[in-house]
């Protein structure tokens, strides 16, 4: 800091006259200045500079200037008298170091400036804050993430600057990017992001960058199922006594707030954390009932690990599972309860100063908290102050109140430089704690003044509020006869500046502590005033300062006060003060009603400052429990504002909080001579300015007087750098919020997400919204931004949507015709009185009530107590196909007796008709899809026809003609032209330039002349002046005629003499077979012509639609669709182009690439609407997300990502070209493209070819002996379409071109030829014409269509592709579609429309009804080709009439196609099959007609391509009724009614059922298949067990890469299925609802790329299965064998296993022989056998086809023998085993375990507590054990045959919980003890 005084210096007499003892400290009489400014300026912020002028008789003009890199960037000035401020607006984009310069002028103008000075400041580029808000914290796949961004300045005003935003997935891949975002209103920006159906699960991040700073917010993507209720665990906040029991509570409530009734299971233990994380406690299991809530005991002594150290820290882990009365389950987990012996933590409060001032009392405060962060009451602490370890100056013991202890050290010696504070817990609630607690320390440094004059501000006693007047007490050790100057800084800027004279309000004297002997060294003090001698009495005067609290001071302000003594010494102090949060923009959001019923309309009322932009959201109340911090709160806003605070980093301890000396005992610490002072410096008045965040420039005031100033110098403390957070702000709690520790599983949806402007003068706005049908509570919130009032956040408002009486039921999504379903209906009564309910269930004709034949509705009576829910069950049978609606209506009547008055319920219909007024009514409708039996099949008849066709030709700016063939007898045509100039038309005898061609030029010579010449570029034979005849802005129409040798050219659509422009007569008529179009060099053009059909310009065709003879009756469906655009079907089915799954990296591209082609087509033809653009870009964004999940670390892609051994060359090229094409429409990270391109080039061979690195899933692309040729062509196409920017990339494509040019003549198969021709054409290779000639020679042309067929492929009988031999079939090898599409791409690239049209017609015939083709690759390539053709031929208009009629005379339909509906897919159902159809069309343009036929067949494959074996294993019935004799079945239903239909308990018993499915398959041709998909449908009412599916992925030898669960189907993906061995999958299925008479289901396997290669096999339950006897239907009860025939050709599936085991017994299973080697430790298997290693266990599981899993060693120590009534089973079935007789009130000392009943419980209820202890002594056999070990484990040594023992299970196990299984062993071993043994962590799945 430098300065220059230009006025005369004051005489030294002024200093000499000042009193030595400091009694007079008046304002200095000499003129001078002091300028204070923020040490950190911020870009875009108006910074305030405070100016103080001493003793000036008049105003001084002060100018301030900010200089960066030597150039002034901003300046300002103002007139100052005594004190004032100047404001500087810092430009945006500025950052780094800058100079702040100031000048003062005005006293003596003739002498120049009065003063000037300068100092360095830091300019921080962050001058605004960004707040990111999402609608939810957790999303499911396919959800849309809704994002709002609020940008504000430090004063909370909107900032309208450009933003950049992007989203990262958990792997760091950039999923989407928004550039140059601009707030749409008041600093608010809205965005949204669609998630794909298979995103990377985990934590995602939204990043927003503004002014060079990045802000982020995270959200999670998880898969979850919406439960019906919410489960919460409320444990104690902490464990007070480790030897006593605490109480916890489990709460289960429906989302609408009502309690859940059901069964509760609790499992808990104590686990160590941090250093003690290796300590694992013992589990305790409890079961009981629950109604809304249930208390339970937490006894830590039973769970805590044995012999834990004194300072152990852990947490109680609690799992709770509730099963409601309707069978719904929910699991919750909590580990938020700390367990530790030291219950109190000590912290010095944030306002406890780190320095003391001699002569003034030191006031401090200690905060005491319990482990959960709550205030600790009644804690006795001892506070000591020491100068040295042996020099104690203060000791006090205080008891805490509300967690606080205040203390005051009356006086500290004036010569003391340091004080050491020690705080220690002495007693809790009066009980001494001894040496159990470690003390906490704080080091205090001295403040120094040479005159011993000190100021001390006293903070207010309470947080300040905006609008009030703040009172600050100021103490001074010198007389209060001075002018007090003050500065208030907040958010890094000066917000208040002023002065006031000091008035003494209190005067007192106090005795100072003795001075230290060490003399005090003075620095920076005038020699005229030596230090005063120590005095016994110190006078202290007290004055006050009153300030108005403004919103700019929220939430944290810094107050600086100072005065100047006559000798120029500045005396100062500063403090920080808190202001309660306050928004100037007061925002509120309220509903018009607090409670409403679902479906009603409510008003959402918003109030904010007028002109505000308000964003409103309404989400389910449970969202707030998902993850803390997801919504924008005032706390987040004001915490961000605190970050603008700039304070001295030397002002606080490096440790944020107390510390102790690690490794030293308390005794050693007390005697230690080492005193660790963290700072060896004192503070002075200059530090007060620095602590406030200010820099000072002055010529009059001396501020720096520190002692021992080695560290604290001008050089050491420049303008301080900004911090990420305020070091003296409220420190974050060391205990995170409890909600963060809780894992929630209920994720509701968003209702409202909307922004609006408040324009009404009243500041109110209203949204009328319809309440969703959900019964729940909705929380409304609002955030507003205003230019005048700034940001505001509303308090949340609650709307409860609730019906006190309602009914609910669920149906399976899909049922097969003939099946019976047991449907639970639940009635909920929350009306406060008992209700007599009449439930009426109505069904349509195709659904029957089992046991009530012929009825369309059934009424049942029930009584429901208040606050409860009651279920009933109804059995339905389904016979009609399609979507069926079921309606339930419930009427409730008040009944105080709850049906105990004897009213009859035998005929509920009669009581239902009584005259009473119902107190509750509800009705619900649900839909269920009923499908036919068998396997669905489909084919599509397609026709693309053009009665007359408009052709669109685009010509580049080069002189090359594009030729179109002339229809016969056509001697005139009209053409619409758009061009700048030089449009040329050629009349030629061939499709190329010929010697005798006629050339017509329009707008030549820069659009001034037109002419006719008799050769290309020939001399004009006729010409005319035609200025501006052409235009690029519009199409202009011309006609051309050559009849009889007279060539005429005219303007307009119709020829006339007046319209002739130029004419010429030839000697003889020209031979015109082709018409060419071009533009000259330097001009581009577009031409539109009509190609006329022959004869009457109409189209007609007749064809037959049929189904196979064996089709399932009633399953036939046919739909006709017409659209006037070749891309139309694709436009209408962009998200579902194939009837195939999309589970790998290549198939996923079907969701991506077609959208690019469609967008390009619509954009090029100017048809892209905002709606279509939004939809297609959403698909692209989702496809991009999905594809990145298949990326490998080296930048390549493979079918299953990192699960594959290497990347795939073919797939990486496919992804590269697709991503490159998408760049025009969505964000594609250039790094992803560069990585893929680099990987590809690295694989190139020396000859320029690309080898097939990785697996090629579609073997057609290998092309036999020329396999490298098509792959090289494919890769070079990808590189060219991506673009070659570098020399390396261009060199790579050149090498590939040379390879293809040399290889093209040798490639004779059409696939290689088509790909090579397209690649050479793209490369503009001279070899391209010859390649095209060869390709044309291989074409198959018939019936006006052109295509290419496979050669050198498998010798496959046509029957392989045809499902039946009755000509009802459709199958073309997908490679043929692909190669034909490449030929079309070549034609469109050359502009050969005439050759392209027959190819388009053939491709259109191969399309499926969804707009795709047969597989992924052919669909993507064909759609790209069709899109390019559509761009080339687009004419803009259509006018067609299409008639369709059936020969059955039951169908006739006329479709009109015109410009307004040409992209609308018009459909009509064809009523009956088989039938003949006749189609006719007339008009202009082309259209695509498709007939989609679907049907079901019993066995679709005559010659299967795979062997397929299916096996269904069911557990034996346990506790079920014995099978009925046939006589009973033939009797009346009353003999054995389904009494459990209305019995919830019975249904629960039936529902706990699981089966094991095993499917094996192998390829029946040589070698192996392409990538294959195995589809396994599940029995109705069952769902797949995900855990068993996940186990399949662990077997690397199986070849299974992925599985998907799609509804009732499980799909398994294999990269190939070999022929040498059986590929098998085995998994479990769990029953969800009871279904009887289950239908046989088809398991199918097929080659993904050639779906005609397939096999299908049916399976069903066995005749004797309990599943076959669940439900009855009259006389045919349980007789599944008598199921009626389902129509011609139908054969029911085999009962029992679908195949005999010996059918595949001779063929080995793939992957059973593992290369295990000799490594690995012994592993206990779930079958009780010890295996040499985990590898050997997997090998045994494969060979035995058994679900063996690793188990704890204790599982191999005992044979778990079930009760005699049960058969042996695997461990995973133990959940259903009834406990043995040894249950309660038994203590077995030898076992170290106890089971006891926790009475009292209601009769019939038992809550069991099981406690684990050390294992008993075992001393024989091969058991490794120790009597001194406390571990409950015991394991076998590695022996050939482990010894087995018998026992009985006495403890139940529930799947999915970490719960023990208990085995009672009466005679464990000879010499052993009787005992109850526990498998400690045996989680049997």
From Swiss-Prot:
Subunit structure comment from the entry: Interacts with heparin.
GO terms for MF: serine-type endopeptidase inhibitor activity
Organism: Homo sapiens
This protein's UniProt keywords: Cell membrane, Disease variant, Disulfide bond, Glycoprotein, Membrane, Protease inhibitor, Secreted, Serine protease inhibitor, Signal
Biased composition range(s): Polar residues: 1819-1831
Gene Ontology, cellular component aspect: extracellular space; plasma membrane
Secretion signal, residue range per the UniProt entry: 1-25
Clinical disorder: Anterior segment dysgenesis 8: A form of anterior segment dysgenesis, a group of defects affecting anterior structures of the eye including cornea, iris, lens, trabecular meshwork, and Schlemm canal. Anterior segment dysgeneses result from abnormal migration or differentiation of the neural crest derived mesenchymal cells that give rise to components of the anterior chamber during eye development.
The keyword Ubl conjugation appears for this protein: no
Main location: secreted
The protein, known as: C3 and PZP-like alpha-2-macroglobulin domain-containing protein 8
Segments for region (Disordered): 1514-1548, 1793-1852
Annotated localization: Secreted; Cell membrane
Any single GO BP term: eye development
